Amino acid sequence: MVNKCGKELRILLDLDKFLTLKNAKIFVFSSLARNFVLSLRQNKKCMKYPLGVQSFGSIRNDGYLYIDKTALVYQIANGGKYYFLSRPRRFGKSLLISTLEAYFLGKKDLFRGLAIDQLEKEWKEYPTLKLSLNVANYTSAKVLNDVLNDATNSWCTQYGITVNGETPSLRFKNLIIALYKKTGSKVVVLVDEYDKPLLQSLDDRELLSQIRGDLKAFYGILKPMDEYVQFGFFTGVTKFSKVSVFSDLNNLTDIAMDQRYVELCGITENEIRTCLDSQVGEMAEANGMSKDECYERLKKTYDGYHFEADTVGIYNPYSLLNALSSKAFKDYWFETGTPSYLIEQLKRTNYPLTNLGTEEITADVLGNIDTIDQSPIPMLYQSGYLTLRSYDKEFEMYHLAFPNLEVERGFTRFLIPYYTQLRSDQGQLFVANFVKELRAGKVEAFMKRLESLFADGDYQVTGNAEFYFQNVVWVIFKMIGFYTEVERHTSDGRIDMIVKTSDYFYILEFKLDKSADEALQQIDDKQYAKPFENDSRHIYKIGVNFSTKTKRIDGWKIAE
């Protein structure tokens, strides 16, 4: 069900239902009402995209687009006690929490016409405590305690209750008991962005330990409270294991990789074709392409998230709706920011960027984040920068890759100032000049530009110089945007790369602590150019040597 035109549409739907329940004599009028409703639904001026709107009530009352997820909401609400769901940022977690809140508060009118309207018969109201930790910058443990105390005070005011307790966790416990005694109903607890305080303290072990302890105590009071609690749901970007704040809540059901709920957040292609087909058509027209071409480009740019093996692809809802609203293909998700802790973890662990897109990992490692010093892959996956591409059943290994073009392009662009001497505002221009030189066959200008990236040999170089060189080359050539093939052998530091343009082939061999002549010789010895000999495009062979001592390119040669 798509809610498009607000109160007017809902009034017409109610009128249509009423008239239909009467007699056949007014069927014609009822049909006219239906046709008018359909015309409203097709009217592009009626479409209101819920960009930045996270309140289920606002979406339903104010006529915003809503793609019906309530059948899954009903299944969750009536199928278990405590749930945990991790999804990338801007993926609809807050809206899901708001939807659950409306359901448990018994707000039946908000769900009229949705799937749950036919499933729920009782619509019982429960005292509901919703907590969002996305409201502060957690620079100290006191900030967290203040947020928890403020939330408890707000709940007490909302329900007319006074509770005591020396700590937020004790006050939380006493509030739940008091609510149960006052209302006679069990309490619902909904927590959004549970992990924000943890993520903001990753680089401060002492603060991380304090915050972990406080959250563990706060959530831990739910374990012995079964007789007072009806339901609990926690969302976040990441799942922590050894630093878990849920270790005392051992009956928490993790549905992050549950096939039944992969469509709970985000939008599927079927939902787009069912609910947004006319809007895709409008976007296609605005961009001078066919509707099929527009679907294909939307899929390539924003689809591709998989939260379990062999499941339907999920579109990033924030990016998709922004694209349809503005009728432009842009990297909307990255405009909202990329957490710097991800880049710091990549650099801290000397992670070879050439491995991105080829990683394989087991489910137990993938679903848990232990420390800030471990592999960055679980964090990259849970944060939405990598997704499941395939699954090896025999060895129970997942193959990870970038989900779509927006993430691959945006993530690589974001890396430039962290791995090169370029500022963030210089990177795109630098890459554009690279591309122009390659297209024009200006190979010497291209190589001088590449060489200049390493001119300051001490710039942000930490740890293994070989990884530094490989990572810089990977970032730049990834940004160039052509078909690029990279082979890396850590035993001798070799990188083979082929770049193709409409008029040229560039075959590059990179060496470490050897010579440009040796690199060129290997291109000939390995016959890298042989597959392209019958192609009309001009072939350039380029040998490059990088010095781990000076951390610069100390020689390059070109052959044709």
Describe the role of every protein-language-model region.
Residues 179-183, 476-502:
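Active-site metal-binding core of divalent-cation-utilizing nuclease and nuclease-like domains
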Residues 208-213, 512-529:
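Mg2+/Mn2+-dependent nuclease catalytic core
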Residues 25-465:
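Phosphate-binding site recognition
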Residues 218-225, 378-386, 474-479, 522-542:
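Metal-dependent nuclease catalytic cores in nucleic-acid-processing enzymes
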Residues 473, 497-512, 526:
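Conserved catalytic cores of phosphodiester-cleaving nucleases, focusing on short active-site segments
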Residues 531, 535-560:
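Domain-level recognition of nuclease-like catalytic cores that cleave nucleotide substrates
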Residues 452-485:
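Acidic-basic catalytic patches of nuclease active cores, encompassing PD-(D/E)XK
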Residues 9-15, 19, 27, 32:
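Short hydrophobic targeting helices and cationic amphipathic motifs
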